[in-house]
C-alpha cells in the first residue's frame, strides 16, 4: 500500500476552489494524465455519485465516498478498477485563499520492493497537477504537461 500527501495554497476563496475541485468532470483541465471524467449516476457531486475516468493508459470507475462542502472530499475507485485508490482532499480557508491537503492511499499492484519507486513517481505527478490547478484557478489559464492549453 502506498500513501503520501501534499498541499497547495491557492489564492482564491474556498467556495470557488471547492466547487471547482468537487466537479470531477473538470479534472482533465488540471491533470494532464486524465482525458475525461463522465458521470455514470443520475446525481453528481454528492456522496454515492459515480463517474468513469479515462486516463492516458487506463480507465477507472470512481465514487464520491464523502463530501463535506468547503471542507473535505473523498474519492475512491470502485472495484475492480485499478489502481485501488482512496483520495482525501481537505480544504481550509487561509489568508483570503484556500489551502488544500491532498492525501493518497493506493494499491498499484506492484511488488513491495518497487512501492517506494512507484510512490515517488505518483507523488511527483500529484505535485505537478496541484501546481496546474493553482495556476488555472489563480490566472484562469494553464498549459498542461502534454501541451494542452486550458482556459476556465
Task: Describe the predicted segments one by one.
Residues 6-8, 39, 60-66, 77, ...:
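Hydrophobic/aromatic beta-strand elements that line small-molecule binding cavities or substrate pockets
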Residues 78-128, 133-135, 144-146:
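Beta-strand/loop substructures that line and gate deep hydrophobic ligand-binding cavities in soluble
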Residues 1-7, 50, 59, 72, ...:
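Intrinsic-disorder/low-complexity, polar/charged segments enriched in Ser/Thr/Lys/Arg/Asp/Glu/Gln
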Residues 32, 56-59:
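Short coil-to-beta-strand transition motifs
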Residues 49-56, 74-80:
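Short beta-strand segments that buttress and anchor functional surface loops
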Residues 14, 42, 65-70, 90-99:
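A short, structured loop/turn motif at beta-sheet edges
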Residues 1-41, 132, 138-139, 148-152:
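Hydrophobic ligand-binding cavity/cleft-lining segments
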Amino acid at each position: 500500500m502506498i500513501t503520501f500527501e501534499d498541499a497547495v495554497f491557492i489564492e482564491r476563496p474556498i467556495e470557488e476552489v471547492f466547487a471547482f475541485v468537487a466537479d470531477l468532470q473538470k479534472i482533465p483541465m488540471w491533470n494532464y494524465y486524465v482525458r475525461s471524467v463522465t458521470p455514470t449516476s443520475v446525481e453528481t457531486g454528492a456522496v454515492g455519485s459515480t463517474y468513469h475516468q479515462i486516463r492516458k493508459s487506463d480507465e477507472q470507475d470512481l465514487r464520491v465516498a464523502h463530501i463535506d462542502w468547503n471542507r473535505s472530499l473523498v474519492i475512491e475507485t470502485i472495484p475492480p478498477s485499478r489502481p485501488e485508490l482512496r483520495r482525501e482532499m481537505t480544504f481550509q480557508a487561509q489568508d483570503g485563499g484556500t489551502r488544500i491537503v491532498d492525501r493518497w492511499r493506493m494499491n498499484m499492484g506492484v511488488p513491495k520492493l518497487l512501492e517506494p519507486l512507484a510512490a515517488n513517481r505518483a507523488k511527483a505527478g500529484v505535485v505537478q497537477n496541484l501546481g496546474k490547478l493553482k495556476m488555472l484557478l489563480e490566472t484562469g489559464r494553464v498549459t498542461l504537461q502534454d501541451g494542452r492549453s486550458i482556459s476556465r
